Amino acid sequence: MERIPSAQPPPACLPKAPGLEHGDLPGMYPAHMYQVYKSRRGIKRSEDSKETYKLPHRLIEKKRRDRINECIAQLKDLLPEHLKLTTLGHLEKAVVLELTLKHVKALTNLIDQQQQKIIALQSGLQAGELSGRNVETGQEMFCSGFQTCAREVLQYLAKHENTRDLKSSQLVTHLHRVVSELLQGGTSRKSSDPAPKVMDFKEKPSSPAKGSEGPGKNCVPVIQRTFAHSSGEQSGSDTDTDSGYGGESEKGDLRSEQLCFKSDHGRRFTMGERIGAIKQESEEPPTKKNRMQLSDDEGHFTSSDLISSPFLGPHPHQPPFCLPFYLIPPSATAYLPMLEKCWYPTSVPVLYPGLNASAAALSSFMNPDKISAPLLMPQRLPSPLPAHPSVDSSVLLQALKPIPPLNLETKD
C-alpha cells in the first residue's frame, strides 16, 4: 500500500517547522475579536447619540407648543367681545385664529378707508391753497354765516311779533328758504334787507312823537283855541281872556287883547308859518315848563260832553274836572300868583266831585259871571297867600308880565 505523502509526517531530515503563533490561528486571533468588540461599542455609541438627540428635540417641541398656546391665549383675550359672542361655549384654538384673522381684515379695511380720506383731504387743502383761500377767509365766512342766521331770525320774529300762534317749525322753514336762496345766488334778499329799516321807521315815530308833543302843545293848541273862540264863540265880556297864553301878555288891557285876537284872525297864514317854524326848530321838549299844556280836545268842550262827562260825579279814583285859564273870572285871579310860583302839573281843578251835575249848574258854569268865588276855589291846593277877591284884572296882567312869551311876535 502506497503512502500518501501528504498524510505521512515529514521525515526527520527535513527542517523543523516553525512553531505555531497566535497569528497562525485565524479563529483564535485576538485582533479579530477586538474588531468585533470595537464594532459593538460603536453601535452603542450611535444609539446613545440618537437618544441624546431625541431628548432636546422633545424639549424644543414642548417649548414651541407652549409658545403657540400662549400666543393663542393672548389673542383670545385681545379679541373684541362681539366676536367672542358669535361662538358658543369654549373657544378652540382654530376658532380663536379664525376670529383673529377676521378682526385683522376689518381693521385693515378701516385703515385703508381712513388713508384714502386723508389723501383726499390733503389734495383738497392743496387745491384750496392753490385757489388762494386762507384760514382767515374761512373764519370770516364761518362768522358771517352765524350773523346772517341771527339777523334772519330777528327779522322774522319782529315781522311776526303780533302773531300768537308762531311755531318753531315756521321759523325753521323760513331759514331753509333763505339758505336755498343764498345757495342759488338769488338777489331777491336785497329787496328784503330794507324790511328792518321800515320797521325801525315804524317804531321810531313813537319816540319823536312824544318829544314833539312838548313844542306842539306849547304852540299849536293855543293858536287853534284862540282862533276858534275869536271867530264868534266869545261872549265879549271881560272874562274871556287868554291870560297871556297866546303870547299876548304884553297888552294894555283885556279889551285890547280881544281886538288883537280878532286882528290876528285875519292873518292866520302868517301865524301858521310862525308856528311851523317853531315846530321845526327843535323836536325835544323844553327843559323848563312855564305854561300848562293843553291839547286840542281839552280846549273845546260842548254841553253834551260836559253833561256826559264822568268827572262831574263823585268818584275817588278819577281826577277832578279841569278848566283852562280863559274861563276863570276876574274874581278868582287872586290865586294866580300862587299858581305862578308852583304850577300844577295838569289843568287847574275848579269843579269838584261833590258838585251836582245838573243842567242848571252847567248853564251857570258856562256863564262864569254868575259863579261865586268860593265855588271856584280849589280845596285840594292850600293857598300860601291870602285871598284878595277884589283884585282888578290889572293885577293879573302885572303878575303875568315877567313870563316870557312863546317865541311869537306880538302886534305893536
Swiss-Prot record:
The modification Phosphoserine is found at residues 235, 383. It is found in: Cytoplasm; Nucleus. One of its GO terms (molecular function) is E-box binding. There is a cross-link at residues 167, 279, 288 (Glycyl lysine isopeptide (Lys-Gly) (interchain with G-Cter in SUMO2)). Residues 248-259 have a biased composition (Basic and acidic residues). There is a cross-link at residue 279 (Glycyl lysine isopeptide (Lys-Gly) (interchain with G-Cter in SUMO1)). Ubiquitinated; which may lead to proteasomal degradation. Sumoylation inhibits its ubiquitination and promotes its negative regulation of the CLOCK-BMAL1 heterodimer transcriptional activator activity. There is a cross-link at residues 159, 279 (Glycyl lysine isopeptide (Lys-Gly) (interchain with G-Cter in SUMO1, SUMO2 and SUMO3)). InterPro entries: bHLH_dom, HES_HEY, HLH_DNA-bd_sf, Orange_dom. It comes from the Eukaryota. Residues 52-107 form the bHLH domain. GO terms for biological process: circadian regulation of gene expression; circadian rhythm; negative regulation of DNA-templated transcription; regulation of circadian rhythm. Its main location: cytoplasm. The keyword Phosphoprotein applies. Transcriptional repressor involved in the regulation of the circadian rhythm by negatively regulating the activity of the clock genes and clock-controlled genes. Acts as the negative limb of a novel autoregulatory feedback loop (DEC loop) which differs from the one formed by the PER and CRY transcriptional repressors (PER/CRY loop). Both these loops are interlocked as it represses the expression of PER1/2 and in turn is repressed by PER1/2 and CRY1/2. This is Class E basic helix-loop-helix protein 40. It comes from Pongo abelii. The lineage of its organism: Eukaryota, Metazoa, Chordata, Craniata, Vertebrata.
